[in-house]
């Protein structure tokens, strides 16, 4: 099957840029990069797969896998006695019913997705396989297979390991410790602090590897639990080997950029302050622009609540970075108000704490608050351009 090197939706402009780059010979390095990615061998992490399969067959909710439908309670709310005569009570009841039904559909879709990825992993259990890549209109490379891939969710990343192994060496062993801290969620500290975090939790790491479902389940408290479990298995095997630095590892150590769109603005504009905010400049510990935006949002919410703003009063507690992260990231790509509202609503529902009938209004208020703050920061990054 012939697949284009770049994904675009019938855009004549994008096609013309691509043709111009090809005519000038500028695509050869790009093709070489895509060839490297496409020729990288992959395997399924058998230890992680066995835990995933046992958890799936039990039907219990674990990590980000919802429980099976027979173990979930999707009880509809009780009808208020005044439902027919009180429009407000009726509206609230309808919104809560919609929330329950939406949760049921969402969990069913999630289980279907997990089941599909598990079956793909099962089919490749004993094989080495490859993931052909192409790129989007921005030049970002992605695997062509849309499901089980190293750019997928936590489960996908936890299930995948490189098809070839290499000795860790001193640097590799340290990075394995740092990776453990990163996937656990301790990623805003210096590299040395992150390495010490993993060393301090060595007993928990061993317990997670030896008894993932019967032990203290430390790995389940991680931000990325399946990647954490994979790292527990790998780090345990390395540290228990005769020479940890000589241990041959195949575990991918993921690294991620900070708000790539704003990184481009900072680089194009030669903006040192902006570069520091998105980790293009060296620093003792990572900067976190998402927490910075969340802090400003919380200041606005507090001021609005003090002034008796009805929408602000719907927000019961401080907004965390996770609520604003996706909206901040997509501001530079032109996210609309409706898109931002939907992004925030999804996070509010996942977090809980806000009644279903208030989610729409609360997410609309937060979108109106977050977008201008993100845009102001974007403009600051562009001021020297």
Q: Locations of the language-model features?
A:
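Non-catalytic nucleic-acid-binding interfaces of large nucleic-acid enzymes and RNP effectors
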Residues: 1-328, 332-385
């Amino acid at each position: 099957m012939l697949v284009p090197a770049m994904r675009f939706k019938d855009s004549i402009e994008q096609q013309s840029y691509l043709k111009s780059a090809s005519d000038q010979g500028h695509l050869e390095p790009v093709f070489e990069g895509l060839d490297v990615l496409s020729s990288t061998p992959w395997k399924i992490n058998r230890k992680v797969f066995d835990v995933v399969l046992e958890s799936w067959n039990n039907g219990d909710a674990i990590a980000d896998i919802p429980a099976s439908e027979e173990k979930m309670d999707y009880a509809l709310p009780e009808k208020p006695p005044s439902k027919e005569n009180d429009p407000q009570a009726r509206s609230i009841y309808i919104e809560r019913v919609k929330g329950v039904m939406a949760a049921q559909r969402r969990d069913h879709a999630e289980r279907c997705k997990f089941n599909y990825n598990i079956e793909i992993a099962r089919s490749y259990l004993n094989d080495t396989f490859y993931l052909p890549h192409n790129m989007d209109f921005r030049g970002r490379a992605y695997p062509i297979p849309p499901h089980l891939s190293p750019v997928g969710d936590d489960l996908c990343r936890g299930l995948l390991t490189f098809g070839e192994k290499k000795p860790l060496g001193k640097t590799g062993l340290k990075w394995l410790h740092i990776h453990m801290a990163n996937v656990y969620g301790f990623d805003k500290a210096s590299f040395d602090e992150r390495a010490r975090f993993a060393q301090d939790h060595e007993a928990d790491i061993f317990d997670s590897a030896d008894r993932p479902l019967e032990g203290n389940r430390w790995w389940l408290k991680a931000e990325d639990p399946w990647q954490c479990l994979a790292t527990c298995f790998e780090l345990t095997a390395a540290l228990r080997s005769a020479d940890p630095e000589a241990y041959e590892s195949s575990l991918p150590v993921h690294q991620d950029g900070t708000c790539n769109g704003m990184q481009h603005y900072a680089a194009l504009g030669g903006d040192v302050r902006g570069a520091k905010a998105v980790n293009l400049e060296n620093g003792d510990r990572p900067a976190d622009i998402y927490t910075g935006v969340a802090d400003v949002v919380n200041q606005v919410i507090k001021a609005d609540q003090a002034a008796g703003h009805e929408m602000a009063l719907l927000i019961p507690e401080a907004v965390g970075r996770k609520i604003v992260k996706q909206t901040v990231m997509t501001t530079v790509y032109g996210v609309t108000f409706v898109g931002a509202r939907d992004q925030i609503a999804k996070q509010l529902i996942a977090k809980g704490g806000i009644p279903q009938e208030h989610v729409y209004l609360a997410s609309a208020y937060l979108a109106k608050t977050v977008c201008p703050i993100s845009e102001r920061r974007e403009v600051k990054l562009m001021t020297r351009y």
